Amino acid sequence: MTPLSSPLSQYWQTVVERLPEGFTETSLSVQAKSVLTFSDFALDSVIAHPEWLAELESASPQADEWRHYAGWLQEALAGVCDDASLMRELRFFRRRIMVRIAWAQTLSLVDDETILQQLSHLAETLIVGARDWLYAACCREWGTPCNPQGVPQPLLILGMGKLGGGELNFSSDIDLIFAWPEHGETRGGRRELDNAQFFTRLGQRLIKALDQPTMDGFVYRVDMRLRPFGDSGPLVLSFAALEDYYQEQGRDWERYAMVKARLMGDNDDAWSRELRAMLRPFVFRRYIDFSVIQSLRNMKGMIAREVRRRGLKDNIKLGAGGIREIEFIVQVFQLIRGGREPSLQSRSLLPTLDAIAALHLLPENDVAQLRVAYLFLRRLENLLQSINDEQTQTLPADDLNRARLAWGMKAENWPQLVGELTDHMANVRRVFNELIGDDEADTPQEEERSEPWREVWQDALQEDDSTPVLAHLADEERRQVLTLIADFRKELDKRPIGPRGRQVLDQLMPHLLADVCSREDAAVTLSRITPLLAGIVTRTTYLELLSEFPGALKHLIMLCAASPMIASQLARYPLLLDELLDPGTLYQPTATDAYRDELRQYLLRVPEEDEEQQLEALRQFKQAQLLRIAAADIAGTLPVMKVSDHLTWLAEAMIDAVVQQAWTQMVARYGQPAHLDERQGRGFAVVGYGKLGGWELGYSSDLDLIFLHDCPMDVMTNGEREIDGRQFYLRLAQRIMHLFSTRTSSGILYEVDARLRPSGAAGMLVTSADAFADYQQHEAWTWEHQALVRARVVYGDPQLTSQFDAVRRTIMTTARDGKTLQTEVREMREKMRAHLGNKHRDRFDIKADEGGITDIEFIAQYLVLRYAHEKPKLTRWSDNVRILELLAQNGIMDEHEAQALTVAYTTLRDELHHLALQELPGHVAQTCFSKERALVQASWRKWLVAV
């Protein structure tokens, strides 16, 4: 065993002072001194449980002792009588065994592969032990879940990721998916439950037993987000539901995740065999699947973006050449060829590496280097985490922990360890890059083209200097360009740019100037780009991105030239530069029905319990998607209707994620309202009004929302901190508003306006569905019924959605006096015009002036409220374009008039989108859109001016 280094020998004196009575310095073995000096976790544990140290001193941990874990846990749980004592014993057992593993790992008593095996078996043992105890307890309470034939149904648990692969790290969380075989009901209990309810309750209790922090800590952080539909899906799924999902909706990234999936307990019963057989075709295709390559490229970009976004230069998992890249290399071959090569179907990385070598898919030397690097990195990761039982992969900055790791990795000192680490990660990165090889590089022609611009950049030409490369520009344009360059250089003098940043900037600027100054609008474009560059000069990573990827630079120039809004966004949030790397996705926004899934995948990379990171990730995702929508808008690949569709689908995905996050936080604190035990869903709905309800969002639109619940009176929550059920929903709505409006470094998510709720700002933030119906029928003003025309549920379970739709239909199909309605709608419009009157008399306000967008909206709303009692089909849609279509189809409005209003409406909205991209207000010269305005005014007079 390597003697303690000098810094650690000195630290030993601090350890001695903390030892419990009875343990003297001389009574401890050299091994004990080494472990207790290395790991604060081990030291804290033996201080609390001195008997563990005596046990370790008398009998060292063995390589195969994982075989005894199940028996040891069974003994520990023998006296457990309730959930509280179960949680206590699970935490005690986990800590005791983890100290043994830390001891064996620190002293290298067991090889590193076996350490990974022990960590994984411990987790599996605890999961299965807790499940089995809780299953029996739930059966005593509610009966045994059975299928229609009376066969008992088990809860099957898929361990995902490193747990499934038998490669768990020291302080890992665990990714699980719960399933049960067949529908049915419980039998033999005090009350019957259907199987879905039984297994959901069992799953909730199991997660609580493992995940909930107590005075004894927790067992594992449990992450359930890999299940179908993520947090918005059922906690537990039947086999049939799982099969439907993976056949119909399973994504590529879910295939990657499923490669490592393993049933906890490794049972070989009929149910387990059925589940394995059902999942295998989804993961491994029968043919050689080269479609993986594009997904592979996307994943590579995702890794690179994550490293840049989170500044992970010292991260041995996510950094360049880190653990994730090795896992990624191996999965590539599994997914491409695994269906044809059974040897590639292993869940574990090292056996799969051996198969890759045997199949000659990589050179033997590369495989050998990857194997050595993997074991080196995994040992370093586990040692790092065992210091404090902390989930981290970032190298320490303090001298003590650096000395600990250097000693634990058998290096002379920290610089030697860093040198070895750098070599291993460089080998991994080389193989990783060669596997895809899609990095861009400058061609000799591009170098030759940019060379003359080096003089312009580096020699600080004055306004009256002449240079051949600027000769094509007009005098004023040339002067502006030179002034902008000179001002930018002066700005740089105020910034703390290091030598590397200066070097990269000097490489980048000639290329940038060559591209910008070839444009007719060179000065305008450069004036938009230099603020962005000034903002990132101290962040060399982003300069390197633009320097190393010429395509990204070209897209940056094109988008900034087209839109100051995009230029401003990029300057405020430079992480969006990552989106420029792939033109295939930049100009092709996410499919309208895929935003929720894309966001779910994006959020999986963020710890579920880290609220701050979750808030940042939501905002970053929104900004990236907005950039892609705007880029497609500028490129002309999205018509105006589609722009709004995409912006609306994006907003709905964000609402879904925010509600999920708020719900999770509230349930963790209070439990859920007890009435939900008797129904599916959450008893909560979010209704979108205005532009959101009408599928007409713009780039900077806020969200008009109201919140509904169906909680009866006198219902309490079922958590340890009970509160009134209706109070729960009020706090939930407040939490949602907070998550939307909290300002982080990435800004706010959306401005949310909830004043359209019953009684407006004076009313309760969240309303019961019954109270909402009563208000709409007996108290609401006509303008509130107009608003209801453009309202729809944007988040909610089917039961509440149906209830809201029925209320909306009832209100809209109520017969009204035509004259009274006409007067009220017209007077409301006149009030709005007086209140929001155009302050630019020589300009036409596209939205608010006569003949503008609001007039068209009022015409549509008036006609729906006037005629829906005769033509109920008019209530079907909430957007103006389809309402106009319905008015024509149902004979209310002449088809020619409806078509003309639709064209006018989309034309005006298109102009508003483009003005937003130019960061211009929504008004134009009075001479603009005269034809459209005249048409709208004529229609207004026809329908809303009294005869």
Curated annotation (Swiss-Prot):
GO terms for molecular function: [glutamate-ammonia-ligase] adenylyltransferase activity; [glutamine synthetase]-adenylyl-L-tyrosine phosphorylase activity; ATP binding; magnesium ion binding. Its EC number is 2.7.7.89, 2.7.7.42. Residues 450-947 are annotated as: Adenylyl transferase. InterPro entries: GlnE, GlnE_rpt_dom, NT_sf, PII_UdlTrfase/GS_AdlTrfase. One of its GO terms (cellular component) is cytosol. It catalyses: [glutamine synthetase]-O(4)-(5'-adenylyl)-L-tyrosine + phosphate = [glutamine synthetase]-L-tyrosine + ADP; [glutamine synthetase]-L-tyrosine + ATP = [glutamine synthetase]-O(4)-(5'-adenylyl)-L-tyrosine + diphosphate. Residues 1-440 are annotated as: Adenylyl removase. Its cofactor is Mg(2+). CDD domains: NT_GlnE_GlnD_like (cd05401). Involved in the regulation of glutamine synthetase GlnA, a key enzyme in the process to assimilate ammonia. When cellular nitrogen levels are high, the C-terminal adenylyl transferase (AT) inactivates GlnA by covalent transfer of an adenylyl group from ATP to specific tyrosine residue of GlnA, thus reducing its activity. Conversely, when nitrogen levels are low, the N-terminal adenylyl removase (AR) activates GlnA by removing the adenylyl group by phosphorolysis, increasing its activity. PANTHER family: BIFUNCTIONAL GLUTAMINE SYNTHETASE ADENYLYLTRANSFERASE_ADENYLYL-REMOVING ENZYME, GLUTAMINE SYNTHETASE ADENYLYLTRANSFERASE. This is Bifunctional glutamine synthetase adenylyltransferase/adenylyl-removing enzyme. It comes from Salmonella typhimurium (strain LT2 / SGSC1412 / ATCC 700720). The gene is glnE.
